[in-house]
């Protein structure tokens, strides 16, 4: 499996930034997940609760700044 260009984590929120090469240069996309425990195992979910929103906003701002700094376009 491909590795993300960058992974940011704040609390239980994780954002992965994926880089893809194109003729116009690098292009980025991202995924957002929330970690939770299912018994003894940590699992990821794309469902977010109301109280997750402030952390998601913070990490998305950091991801956006990283993408701007590292060039490239959004997918």
Show where each model-derived region lies.
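Single-stranded nucleic acid-binding surfaces, predominantly the OB-fold ssDNA-binding core
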Residues: 1-75
């Amino acid at each position: 499996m491909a590795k993300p260009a960058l992974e940011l984590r704040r609390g239980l929120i994780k954002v992965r930034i994926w880089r893809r090469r194109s003729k116009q240069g690098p292009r980025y996309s991202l995924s957002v997940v929330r970690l939770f425990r299912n018994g003894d195992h940590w699992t990821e979910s794309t469902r977010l609760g109301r109280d997750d929103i402030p952390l998601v906003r913070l990490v998305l701002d950091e991801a956006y700044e990283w993408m701007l700094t590292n060039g490239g376009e959004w997918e």
